[in-house]
Amino acid sequence: MPIVEFRIDPWSSEGLRDYEKLFAYFGVRPFKEVIHRLEFFGPLPLPIRRGAVIGHRDFERVLHALENNSDFAILTGLMPSGKMHLGHKMLIDQVIYYQRLGAEIFLAIADVEAYGVRKLSREEVINIALDEYVANYLALGLETRKLHIYFQSNYRREYYRLIQLFAKKVTMAELVAIYGEDLEPAKIMAVLTQAADILHPQLPHFGGFKIVLVPVGLDQDPHLRLTRDIADRFSEELGFTRPASTYHKFLTGLTGGKMSSSKPESFIALTDPVNESVSKLMKAFTGGRATAEEQRRLGGEPDKCPVFELNQLHLVLEDEELRKIYEDCRSGTMLCGECKLATAERLRKFLEKHQEKLASMKEKARSLVELPDF
């Protein structure tokens, strides 16, 4: 089967849904194989507990670190090119969980890529990164202990040295095979920079963490595959080991398809006015039938419903409550309008509480990061 059929574009991977086929092709293991070992360390965050995290590479190494009280690090990044929405929250919920288990957190602000590939101004990039993302992360519960936040354009010289060294052992043919032929210089720079993001915590200058976990959506797997190959090529010279990774599903957008920052109608942003967010929710696509009569007879389809997914991954904490919502929908006992009203009230309470915390976090966010000079 030609590789082009399975190529994943990290800059535009709309509609990636056939996870099992993709995982089999790229050698990703089901996360359900290892989740029972993670349960030993306490309550799991909703994305893990309710099946949104579906795949992994080498997660056993992270489990070994936890079981032996060894150090490990999390590398995550943010793309400051739009509003932070609930799809992004699904990732940071995982990061906060691992931080509470003792992980050192490295948070890369991808300002180089936002400027070079997404074509935003430097001022926009910096303001979005801090006010829209870092501040929200802090309000959601990310702690400042064991936390390292940096702009890709304003970090330490050892990090930049990695980018230069990596360029020697990566070929254009390899990049084209992974990313396709539409590779402008800005994308090549972004790719090598992300490899440095993922591997630099292993250097002694940054703590020498030999176990680094990168939780991502499947669209970012091309970067992980390339970085694992780079780690192999520098295993003797720099002592690098392959990073571990986990993969989560995309959160379904309110209009169907992927929740995306480029489609405002598809997402619930954490900073939007509460009434505006509730209004979006009330207009959302659902897993309901064509008529109320048909839904009472056949039942709804919560597994296809973005409104149910918001409850599942963000708004309903108790499993028994979620189970009742699911069963009432499937049986036709509850219609979509009733479900939307109840979900809207949960969303309102969540956003009001979150935005109250957020108000005090913007100044704190700016105090944690050294800003680029230009």
Task: Identify the function of each model-found stretch.
Residues 84-89, 96, 111, 121-125, ...:
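Structured ligand/cofactor/substrate-binding pocket environments in proteins
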Residues 1-2, 134-136, 169-181, 206-222, ...:
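Short flexible/disordered coil segments
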Residues 86, 118, 122, 160-161, ...:
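Short amphipathic alpha-helical patches
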Residues 157-163, 226, 254-258:
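Short, solvent-exposed polar/charged micro-motifs at secondary-structure junctions
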